[in-house]
Amino acid sequence: MLSFDYSIPTKVFFGKGKIDVIGEEIKKYGSRVLIVYGGGSIKRNGIYDRATAILKENNIAFYELSGVEPNPRITTVKKGIEICRENNVDLVLAIGGGSAIDCSKVIAAGVYYDGDTWDMVKDPSKITKVLPIASILTLSATGSEMDQIAVISNMETNEKLGVGHDDMRPKFSVLDPTYTFTVPKNQTAAGTADIMSHTFESYFSGVEGAYVQDGIAEAILRTCIKYGKIAMEKTDDYEARANLMWASSLAINGLLSLGKDRKWSCHPMEHELSAYYDITHGVGLAILTPNWMEYILNDDTLHKFVSYGINVWGIDKNKDNYEIAREAIKNTREYFNSLGIPSKLREVGIGKDKLELMAKQAVRNSGGTIGSLRPINAEDVLEIFKKSY
């Protein structure tokens, strides 16, 4: 296990009715707020009305940025920055899932950057100051409610990039599982796949000896496997929604990657799919993951897949190691299929003509390779894309 520094300062208010705290919490940072949200579901399910009522009760002025895309775009970020500057906003409040929160993070950082915001996304060292950020979570998926990363798309350049800064962690986040009762089944499925993929990225590391972190990762994966199906079948099951919501936060808030390197595999590949074809992130990850697993399985990586098969899927440890590994990968594929997620890239509109270009793009920002357990290059990525097609 590598050395590390540990600090996850986001304050979490978890449970039914926890939205009531936002007035007092926001007033610690000021009295002018930008609310950032997506397509309007928060108005239909009452969250918007409750949040704005609390703001009014506490004499907090608020402004709005709606219409944040599922893959939030830099053009939308720039609109939010202008609203903040024009109204001297003190805090950015995201109400929604990872898209709204990611958009809010880059707005909050961009307020203090005088150049082109996209340049700041490409080079996070340009971030010098960030407005306070808070979130009210309505979708269990990205874990953005507790981490310092945002992912933003530029449709003009076909780029989807991650940007991070310690001050981009939300000051506080409200996690009320009842707010996810109305999430459609397809979004629940994609969100569950996203949580599992975040966990896989830390779990399948080339760094050995992080026993505690791996044990937590295995528990999160078992949680997703159990409660993802339950949440699909009974959308208002509180325990299912609560466990998925907490798993979402723990999967990517930094805990699982402590003492490990942070060289991810499937996310850089999927970001290219989303950048060019604007597909649902979790769907792309679910398609790629089993094929990536099959591709990197060899004598050197076998031990990790054996642990995964035994500790997550409960496969008999007395079986042959390769049999355990292949059964674990097969179970992963079948689980995503059971959630109703497409299994082929062609099913979600990906064109064959761009596979080679996207493979090269996937490794361009990481020295030509991605991944930790078994690093892969552009040629490897192309083969995984072909296997997934």
UniProtKB/Swiss-Prot annotation:
GO MF annotations in UniProt: alcohol dehydrogenase (NAD+) activity; alcohol dehydrogenase (NADP+) activity; butanol dehydrogenase (NAD+) activity; metal ion binding; methylglyoxal reductase (NADPH) (acetol producing) activity
UniProt xrefs under PROSITE patterns: ADH_IRON_1, ADH_IRON_2, AMP_BINDING
Annotated pathway: Alcohol metabolism; butanol biosynthesis
Keyword match NAD: yes
Gene Ontology BP term (one): 1-butanol biosynthetic process
Pfam families the UniProt entry points to: ADH_Fe_C, Fe-ADH
Enzyme Commission (EC) number: 1.1.1.-
Protein's UniProt keywords contain Oxidoreductase: yes
A cellular component term, taken from the record's GO annotations: cytosol
SUPFAM superfamilies in the record: Dehydroquinate synthase-like (SSF56796)
Domain of life of the source: Bacteria
Alphabetical UniProt keywords: NAD, Oxidoreductase
The protein's assembly and partners: Homodimer.
Similarity comment text for this entry: Belongs to the iron-containing alcohol dehydrogenase family.
More details: Primarily NADH-dependent, although some NADPH-dependent activity was observed.
Protein name: NADH-dependent butanol dehydrogenase A
Organism from which the protein derives: Clostridium acetobutylicum (strain ATCC 824 / DSM 792 / JCM 1419 / IAM 19013 / LMG 5710 / NBRC 13948 / NRRL B-527 / VKM B-1787 / 2291 / W)
